[in-house]
Amino acid sequence: MNKGKIVAIGGGGFEDGEMMPVFEKIVALSEKEAPKVISLPTAGHDHTDGEWVLEKIFGELGCSSFKTITITTAGLSKEELRAEILSADIIFAGGGNLEFLMNVWNESGAADALREAFEAGKVLAGVSSGAMCWFDEGYDDCGENGSFMFVDCLGLLPWCNCPHFENAGWQSFIPAVRSRLRSGIACENGAALVWADGKYEPVCGRLGGTVWLLNREKNFEMTPVDKECLNK
């Protein structure tokens, strides 16, 4: 599992430049002078209000093109969607409802295309639900009346993931993950977990942030992630 590259962001401010160091990492991982970017706002029910912020950020970082694909309204066939996804160097998934995202991706063929993109060495990035989607499972408040639930995801990273972990409500992940068969990764706003070149590392924005490992082999002991602890 060392072809593709993943940047999973727990949350944070995009418009104010807080997360620019993380976006710089995303673009650098593409290893292209002027990478092409595709944005998938699926988790936000394909609302595009915030897309201009992403387009501005990636443009400032030298990306040659930025395209938003609203899968639920674009009317693309599975083959057309696959071609769009594989044409990009960077695919960025926005936040919202993780269960909705996975349902749409599974039904549309996007899930298979994104797995193929990973194998082809593309950079897969995203925030909140758009970060959880790359893991085995995500922990999201997309259940009935905003309740938390686990959602099966793409399985490219081998843990349960929880974003926004500095928030007390999201820390319900700590007891909840004990019911799972795998360890948990929890990302605070401002923090991201990066997978590249066969190794993991945490990266944070200008205001800092921590990525936490809840290790099942150690009774879900909580440890800040550094460059060493996941690469042993």
Short names for language-model regions:
Residues 13-17, 67-72, 101-104, 162-163:
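Short, flexible loop segments at the rims of nucleotide/cofactor-binding pockets, characterized by
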Residues 94, 100-167:
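Class I SAM-dependent methyltransferase SAM-binding "motif I" and its flanking Rossmann-like core
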Residues 5, 34-36, 65:
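Residues at the starts of beta-strands that form the adenosine-phosphate
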Residues 38-39, 44-96, 100:
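Portal/gating segments that form or line small-molecule/metal binding sites
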Residues 1-32, 44-60, 90, 138-140, ...:
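C-terminal and late-domain segments of enzyme folds
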Residues 8, 67-68, 92-93, 124-127, ...:
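General beta-strand structural signal in soluble alpha/beta enzymes
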